[in-house]
Amino acid sequence: MLKTILPTIMLIPLAWFTSNNMVWINTTLYSFTISLTSLHLLYQPLDNSLNLSPEFFLDSLSTPLLILTIWLLPLMLIASQSHLSSGSTFQKKSYITTIILLQVSLIMTFAATDLILLYIMFETTLIPTMVIITRWGNQLERLNAGSYFLFYTLMGSLPLLVTLMLIQNTLGSLNLMMLPYLIKPIDNLWSTNMLWLTCTMAFMVKMPLYGLHLWLPKAHVEAPIAGSMVLAAILLKLGGYGMLRITILLDPLTTHMYYPFLMLSLWGMVMSSSICLRQTDMKSLIAYSSVSHMALVIIAIMLQTPWSFMGALTLMIAHGLTSSMLFCLANSNYERIHNRTMILARGLQTLLPLMATWWLLASLINMAPPPTINLIGELLIITTSFSWSNFTIFPMGLNVLITTMYTLHMMTTTQRGKTSHHAKSIKPSFTRENTLMALHFLPLLLLSLNPKIILGLTY
């Protein structure tokens, strides 16, 4: 693991000591090299001892999320260049440093062997993310968004810390490989139910569960492009990863406790999709669509079957790349018309035909057509939910229908129609932007050819 963590940390001195006109090029190329050299980790043989140490370990659950995190760093740097073009060199280097610190804490979260280390790194990601939102956001409301993000996350996480301390005192270890052998069968008591709730609530806030999601649209809308990308692609997946780890350990309790959360997720999935139909703000629409997709992941994790675990991990990876691509496209529109309102960006297809092609591809992937990994993830989750109850066909079918509707609404509103007068003299699409979209689309394409490497522990 150190061969990934140490080069990433060394990006910080590279950013500060490189010449001013080469700061973006050097950091992007170096981080892209780290991404490419880390891809070999996706090959997980049956013997995991090569990826094991007292502090860090990788298995087929954490590796795909870790690779997604590493892959996203150069993409964030490519996307941020225009946003910081008018800033001073010190601002640019500070921004890059903040992103790298966030990256290191995310890598250590996904690779943590100990639950306390996982908790510490999980909380550490909060600080750089909040700095990115409150320091480099576009509007004044970014301070309000930062406050929401901070307090929702902290209020969900503090009970988890107390519970972890309690488990440490009782069992003597929080090592993820030791815990399955130390935990005794848990009775369905009021106290153990509370223990399950405190363990999962921190991750449900992060997912977010419908009802605890109010911080997400605010944070997405006010964050700069790198903040939106890392929020959508990685930070929401931290919740899913934590829930997968914890619910497997507290196994018998999950089958007693899952019912209200399943109902809330099924309801929230349809509601957040419906909210998307009424949005005028591009980034807000994509943020609410993330809530809808993550509700599917919560349903999959709660059902606790091998198929649902495969579906949850596949959908998390697929959604990470898709939503990040959509945020990049929304940002490219914002950089040209300086407004997030969709109706003001209408008719851009005639002015930016290549960008319209990327919009079409991203919209299609968001609707989960075959042969994309989005479809594989959704199919696995939907079939598992049918095996739990046949009545889930109604909310699931409705969600698929509404997802298609709001995606087409977003596509047609921004690309079709008569071009507005203020959009006549906009800049053309740059090679940098097309490269960025291609680097989002290429992994989705390649993974659809061989999805088994991201199907997780139960494949």
Curated annotation (Swiss-Prot):
GO terms for biological process: electron transport coupled proton transport; mitochondrial electron transport, NADH to ubiquinone; mitochondrial respiratory chain complex I assembly. It comes from the Eukaryota. Its main location: mitochondrion. One of its GO terms (cellular component) is mitochondrial inner membrane. Its EC number is 7.1.1.2. It catalyses: a ubiquinone + NADH + 5 H(+)(in) = a ubiquinol + NAD(+) + 4 H(+)(out). The keyword Translocase applies. It is a multi-pass membrane protein. It is found in: Mitochondrion inner membrane. This is NADH-ubiquinone oxidoreductase chain 4. It comes from Loxodonta africana (African elephant).
